[in-house]
Design a protein with these regions (language model features):
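Binuclear metal-ion centers of metallo-dependent hydrolases, dominated by the metallo-beta-lactamase
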Residues: 68, 80-93, 170, 174-222
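Active-site neighborhood of phospho(di)ester-bond hydrolases with catalytic His/Asp-centered motifs
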Residues: 22-24, 42-50, 70-73, 131-136, ...
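Glycine/small-residue-rich loop that forms an oxyanion/phosphate-binding "nest" at active or ligand-binding sites
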Residues: 50, 56-114
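Zn-dependent metallo-beta-lactamase
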Residues: 1-20, 27-30, 96-99, 103, ...
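Active-site environment of divalent metal-dependent phosphoester hydrolases
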Residues: 29-30, 51-56, 76-78, 93-96, ...
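Active-site-proximal loop/helix segments of hydrolase catalytic cores
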Residues: 109-175
Length: 222
């Protein structure tokens, strides 16, 4: 089984067989997080874009642990310039790692870094396919992501204001056709306050997918 921990916002960790991936490791100044970033251990860090609430503690954690930052070329180059191990990619690209593979997907959002783009990830982690959409608006080509991948778990933002909201996320589920949806990027601050329970009700009424609400700082097995 894979251990998934939700540290709030878009901060996720995946662990299996002593390999841990962190995604968008926003610990410091995250009002819903209870984890001390100085105690976090990991092997890889995926960063979807360079806004403070997504790149978060990536540089400090990578320096301390030796973890490899996997991100777009601009973020990877910046991380390397600060003394981190990094692996640069770009939208549409896929690369194999010890745990499986990472493919970089489109996300409609600002980048937070000069010359960069925001992105999402298709993560093949020990034979589970996990789609981390990143901060994104709804876009038509999300249907291609669903068509080309048998998605076990889709991690979708529902907060609105900065990303798609619950109504758009519902449409994304219809196009992606995942087995399970985990809502993220909500309730960190008042502008993105949402009811994941209402989202769950609408998705399960209109789609075949199940919605799994993971409480902040909770770990589950998937």
């Amino acid at each position: 089984m894979i251990k998934l921990k939700y540290n709030g916002h878009a901060n996720i960790s995946l662990t299996k067989d002593n390999v841990t991936i962190l995604i968008d490791p926003f610990f410091t100044d995250n009002p819903v997080n209870k984890t001390n970033p100085n105690e976090v251990e990991c092997d890889y860090i995926l960063v979807s874009h360079a806004h403070f609430d997504h790149i978060g503690d990536a540089i400090d954690i990578a320096k301390r642990t030796g973890a490899t930052i996997i991100s777009t070329a601009e973020i990877a180059n910046m991380a390397e310039s600060k003394g981190c191990n990094s692996h640069g990619m770009n939208i549409g690209g896929k690369f194999n790692f010890e745990f499986g593979s990472v493919k970089v997907t489109q996300a409609i959002h600002s980048a937070g870094i000069e010359g960069g783009v925001a992105c999402g990830f298709i993560i093949d982690f020990y034979a589970k396919t996990i789609y981390f959409a990143g901060d994104t608006a709804l876009f038509g080509d999300i249907e291609l992501i669903g068509r080309m991948n048998n998605i076990d778990y889709a991690l979708l933002p529902i907060g609105d204001n900065f990303t798609m909201g619950p109504e758009e996320a519902l449409e994304a589920v219809k196009m992606l056709k995942p087995n399970v949806v985990i809502p993220i990027h909500y309730d960190t601050w008042p502008p993105i306050a949402q009811s994941p329970q209402d989202f769950k009700k609408e998705v399960e009424k209109n789609c075949d997918a199940k919605v799994l609400i993971v409480d902040f700082n909770e770990s589950i097995e998937i």
